[in-house]
Regions:
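Repeated loop/turn-to-beta-strand initiation elements of outer-membrane beta-barrel proteins
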Residues: 31-34, 80-83, 137-141, 191-196, ...
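C-terminal beta-signal and adjacent terminal beta-strands/loops
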Residues: 151, 251-263, 286-346
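Signature of Gram-negative outer-membrane beta-barrel scaffolds
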Residues: 1-78, 104
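Outer-membrane beta-barrel translocator domains and adjoining extracellular loop/strand segments
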Residues: 46-54, 96-102, 109-110, 153-161, ...
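Transmembrane beta-strands of outer-membrane beta-barrel pores
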Residues: 40-46, 87-93, 100-102, 133, ...
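Outer membrane beta-barrel strand-and-loop segments of large Gram-negative receptors
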Residues: 8, 116, 120, 126, ...
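Gram-negative outer-membrane beta-barrel transporters
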Residues: 146-149, 166-259
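Residue-level signature of outer-membrane beta-barrel architecture
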Residues: 22, 26-28, 32, 73-77, ...
Length: 346
C-alpha cells in the first residue's frame, strides 16, 4: 500500500501475516461434544514515513507472535435442548492510518485526525455460556451470558487544537464487558400467517475501563460499546411464487464515540463525545421470474432519524452542588437509500 502527496502526509507500509491452526473434535457419548484448537499467528507491520511536520523520518517494524486458544463444549440435554460453553482469545490490530503519524482532515467531523505510532495490539479473552432450544424446524430460542476482558483496548480520543478538534487513537490499560443476550426465531404459521417468521436479538451489556491508580480518568464505559442493542425483523418467504421480503428494525444505546481529556478539576474536563440512540428501519423485496431473472428492491434507513453526537458536561459549583449540561457537537440525517436491481443467471 502506498499513499503520497507531501512528506508530512505520505508513507509506505506493508504487513505480513502467517498463521497455522491445530484443532480436534472430541465426542463423549452421544450428548457431550468438544471442539478445541489453537491458532498461531506471526504478524509484522512495517511503515516508513515522516513526522506530522514532514521533517523527521519515522520507521516502524512491529513484530508479534501470538497463540489464540479456543474451546467450545456442547451438551445435548435432549433432541431440542442444548447447553453450550465457549472460550476464545482474539486480537484487534491497529489499521495503517491509526499508526502513521501524519495528519489528515475529516470533512464530516470538520476536524483533523492523526495516527499514533505507539499504538499496540489489543487482545480480548471471551467467555460465553448459552442455552439453546429448538422447538420446531427453523425455529430457535437461545439465552446466553458472556464476559470479555480486554488488554490494551484501542479507543479513539480527541483534544482541542487551536480553533478546532484533533482526533487520534490510544490504548487504554484494561477493560471488561459482561452481559446477557437473547436470540429468537419463530414461525407465525400457528396464527395463519404462513411463510412469515419473526426474528429478534437483544442484549444488555455492561462495560468498564480500568485505569492506572492515581490517574485523572474516572469510571466510564468502553468507547464504542452500547449498553444495549435491539434487532428485530419480519421475514416472508413464498418459494412457489419466488417471493421473499423482510422488514428489519435496529436500535443501539448511547455509546462513547471519542474519549475526551479528564483533568484533576472536573470543571476543566474535555468531556467524552457520545453517539446518541437512534432507530433504523430497512425494507427489502425480491421476486424470481423463471429460473434466470430476479428483481430486487430495497429501502435502507426508512425513518431517516438524526445521527446525533453530544457531550454531557459535569460541573461542580462553589457550594459543592453538581449539575450536568448537555450540548450538541454535531448532527445530520443520513438520508434514505432506495435501490432497485435485476440479476440474471446464465
Amino acid at each position: 500500500m502506498r499513499e503520497t502527496t507531501t512528506n508530512s502526509d505520505s508513507y509506505t507500509s506493508e504487513n505480513i501475516l502467517g498463521a497455522a491452526y491445530v484443532s480436534a473434535k472430541l465426542n463423549y457419548g452421544e450428548a457431550l461434544n468438544a471442539n478445541i484448537g489453537v491458532r498461531m499467528e506471526y504478524y509484522n507491520l512495517k511503515m516508513d514515513g515522516y513526522s506530522s511536520d514532514g521533517t523527521t523520518p519515522v520507521h516502524l517494524d512491529n513484530r508479534t507472535s501470538d497463540f489464540f486458544p479456543s474451546v467450545n463444549i456442547s451438551y445435548n440435554l435432549s433432541a431440542k435442548h442444548l447447553v453450550r460453553a465457549a472460550y476464545g482469545r482474539s486480537v484487534n490490530r491497529p489499521e495503517f492510518r491509526e499508526v502513521v503519524p501524519y495528519v489528515y482532515f475529516n470533512f464530516e467531523r470538520d476536524a483533523n485526525i492523526v495516527g499514533n505510532t505507539e499504538l499496540k495490539n489489543a487482545y480480548a479473552d471471551n467467555l460465553e455460556v448459552r442455552y439453546e432450544f429448538y422447538p420446531a424446524s427453523g425455529e430457535m430460542i437461545t439465552i446466553g451470558a458472556f464476559y470479555k476482558r480486554f488488554k490494551d483496548p484501542i479507543e479513539e480520543t480527541y483534544n482541542e487544537a487551536g480553533s478546532g478538534l484533533q482526533y487520534t487513537y490510544h490504548n487504554a490499560k484494561n477493560a471488561e464487558t459482561f452481559g446477557i443476550e437473547l436470540d429468537m426465531k419463530k414461525s407465525l404459521d400457528f396464527i395463519g400467517l404462513r411463510g412469515l417468521s419473526l426474528v429478534c436479538n437483544a442484549a444488555y451489556i455492561h462495560s468498564r475501563v480500568r485505569f492506572e491508580e492515581g490517574a485523572p480518568e474516572r469510571d466510564r464505559p468502553l468507547a464504542g460499546q452500547s449498553p444495549y442493542l435491539v434487532n428485530a425483523g419480519l421475514f416472508y418467504q413464498h418459494d412457489d411464487k419466488g417471493i421473499s421480503a423482510s422488514l428489519l428494525y435496529n436500535r443501539i444505546g448511547k455509546r462513547i464515540e471519542s474519549v475526551g481529556v479528564p483533568m484533576q478539576d472536573q470543571n476543566e474536563d474535555i468531556p467524552d463525545i457520545y453517539e446518541m440512540p437512534r432507530n433504523s428501519l430497512d425494507l427489502t423485496f425480491s421476486k424470481k421470474i423463471g429460473k434466470a431473472v430476479e428483481i430486487k428492491a430495497g429501502i435502507q434507513d426508512m425513518l431517516n432519524s438524526k445521527i446525533e453526537y453530544k457531550q454531557f458536561v459535569k460541573l461542580t459549583d462553589k457550594n459543592g452542588g453538581k449539575r450536568e449540561r448537555e450540548q450538541l457537537v454535531r448532527s445530520y440525517r443520513p438520508g434514505v437509500d432506495i435501490n432497485v436491481g435485476v440479476s440474471l443467471k446464465f
